[in-house]
Regions:
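Short, basic-rich loop-to-helix N-cap that marks the start of a DNA-contacting helix
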Residues: 259-273
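Recognition helix of helix-turn-helix/homeodomain-like DNA-binding domains
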Residues: 246-263, 287-290
Length: 334
């Protein structure tokens, strides 16, 4: 199942479980914990008091009561004290133990906040990496649907170095291209009606009276055929492809079982990333689905940057797209 990044109030998530990042005393809550407690009701607070305490890296579970979620999983993140006291391992344990507890209780979906990157002082970039690496590693062996929930855009941003490189690429390609395009538009408007109509080879055959049946036979290789030929050529398993593409198994099955499947552009990009395609290969696959990779679109320009630089980590790409308010690759909306 995919890792979905959403901007939402975690108390409103309709998942089987949500995660509350708490202090050691579960009867006392921080800002987010208080919001969860207020939404869940008095019985929730009573159960928290019965649980008592939670050690750093540990996870405990209560019912969700008045929340849309069936359960709340409580975990205590580490306070950052310089990075030399095992904070990274403790933070990883928070995510791992919460996921294990969710699975033990039959949860098929879970929503996480970013743990310890707020008041506990964990460096945001490092905290995001631990969260996404731990979750994506867990997803290799489970069908659980996992959400990373952030309150605002500033909570989840690309690293400063990466963002600087991407912004430069956008300035060189997307911005300049669109400025030039606006100038060309004026010229094109003056030339309407002057250009001759040019037919492709297929159009000429059809215009000459070729039967519809023969015309259809002459069509190009389909997206479906091209995709599975590429998977075979790359020597990859289907499970490896849909995991790397941040797609659910059921979504990939639809693609596999429907020869006429028409994917969204974001899905094609996700599959290109999963297959580690070059930019030319990506353009060809995109064309088979009826799209083009164009600098006229911010999404295309950002993904092109990652492909041309050989960076195929779909979570890193999605964090960047999220940072620029663009659709995510392989992401399933809640």
């Amino acid at each position: 199942m995919p890792l979905n990044i959403v901007r939402q109030d975690i108390t409103k998530m309709h998942t089987d479980a949500i995660v509350a990042a708490e202090g050691h005393d579960l009867s006392s809550h921080g800002m987010v914990g208080s919001a969860i407690a207020n939404a869940a009701g008095t019985d929730y607070q009573k159960e928290c008091e019965k649980l008592g305490t939670c050690k750093t890296g540990e996870a405990k579970i209560t019912k969700g009561y008045n929340l849309p979620a069936k359960y709340v999983i409580h975990t205590t993140g580490p306070k950052y004290t310089g990075g030399n006291n095992g904070e990274d391992l403790l933070l990883k344990a928070c995510y791992e133990n919460a996921l294990k507890l969710a699975e033990e209780n039959g949860c098929e979906s879970i929503a996480f906040p970013l743990i310890s990157t707020g008041g506990y002082g964990f460096p945001k970039e490092e905290g995001i990496k631990i969260a996404t690496d731990t979750i994506t590693g867990y997803l290799e062996n489970t069908d659980m649907d996992i959400y990373l929930v952030v309150y605002d855009k500033e909570s989840l941003t690309a690293s400063k170095t990466l963002r600087s490189e991407i912004q430069e690429y956008i300035d060189d390609n997307y911005v300049r291209r669109n400025r030039a395009f606006r100038n060309l538009e004026r010229e094109d408007l003056d030339m309407v009606g002057e250009a001759p109509v040019v037919y492709s080879g297929l159009e000429k055959k059809h215009a000459a009276g070729t039967s519809l049946e023969n015309f259809i036979k002459d069509r190009d290789e389909s997206f479906h055929e091209t995709l599975f030929k590429l998977i075979k050529e790359k020597g990859m398993k289907n499970s490896e492809v849909y995991t790397r593409a941040n797609l659910s198994k059921s979504h990939f099955s639809k693609i596999k079982n429907d020869p006429d499947y028409r994917p969204k552009k974001e899905t094609v990009f996700a599959l290109a990333i999963a297959l580690r395609l070059t930019l030319d290969e990506t353009r060809e696959l995109m064309k088979k689905a009826g799209y083009a990779v164009s600098h006229s679109f911010m999404l295309d320009t950002i993904v092109e940057y990652f492909i041309t630089n050989g960076k195929y980590n779909i979570v890193e790409i999605n964090i960047t797209l999220f940072d620029y308010d663009q659709p995510l690759l392989g992401e399933k909306a809640l």
